[in-house]
Amino acid sequence: MENKNQKHNNEFHEKNQQSQKDNNNVKKENLHEDQSDLNDANFDDGGKKNKLKNDIKKLNHLVDSLKNENNNKQAKIESLERQINLLNENFKSEVIKKASEAQTKLDEKIKEFQAKYETELKHAKKYALKSSAIELIDIVSNFELAVNSKVTNPEIANYLKGFQMFANMFKNYFQQNGITEIPVNLNDDFNAEVMQAFETQKAPNTQPNKVIKIIKKGYKLHDIVLVPATVIVSE
């Protein structure tokens, strides 16, 4: 009887141990599955984070590229503005330089003429100024051509006003010393004694051999023609 009970107890104990083993195995399997699910979830989150990082990196790269492109365009604009300013400054400097050179030459001519005039005035007779006057008349004629030209630059216009002042000063000087303009008007008959024909042109409703345009004024010293008036004559 005791043997049977002992045997029965042993069997129950073995079954109980087996049941515990089975339960432990089930728990381990469930734990493994939970861990696997957790790893899968972590993998998905990590993939999203990496994709987000890559997207942010691409956006930053695009922003940097746009900034560089904008900086390059701004640099080109600034370079062009500097070139334009430099050209304007060079043009202005060139105009001032030419005007200064003309002023210097004019001052030299005035001094030369005054010195020569004062010397000749003492020793020459009535027409002693002829050669000097012709040279000066040519200068005055060039001044008048420059003054009568149309300009839009204010600085050049101011220099031309200065040229006009010098031309007027010389004309007064001429009058004081017997040098006068030869009177020539449009539609006057061409007079070879006081005029020279620059060219002839057809002029409708105008008789032949008439003055239709005055190119340069003529001058005489007392009764001698120094420089004939240059005109265009009708055919």
UniProtKB/Swiss-Prot annotation:
Q: Where is the composition biased (Basic and acidic residues)?
A: 1-16, 24-35
Q: Which domain of life is it from?
A: Bacteria
Q: Where is this region: Disordered?
A: 1-51
Recorded GO terms, molecular function?
adenyl-nucleotide exchange factor activity; protein homodimerization activity; protein-folding chaperone binding; unfolded protein binding
- CDD domains given in the database record: GrpE
What are the protein's UniProt keywords? Chaperone, Cytoplasm, Stress response
Write out the function statement from the record: Participates actively in the response to hyperosmotic and heat shock by preventing the aggregation of stress-denatured proteins, in association with DnaK and GrpE. It is the nucleotide exchange factor for DnaK and may function as a thermosensor. Unfolded proteins bind initially to DnaJ; upon interaction with the DnaJ-bound protein, DnaK hydrolyzes its bound ATP, resulting in the formation of a stable complex. GrpE releases ADP from DnaK; ATP binding to DnaK triggers the release of the substrate protein, thus completing the reaction cycle.
Family (UniProt): Belongs to the GrpE family.
**Protein name stated in the entry:** Protein GrpE
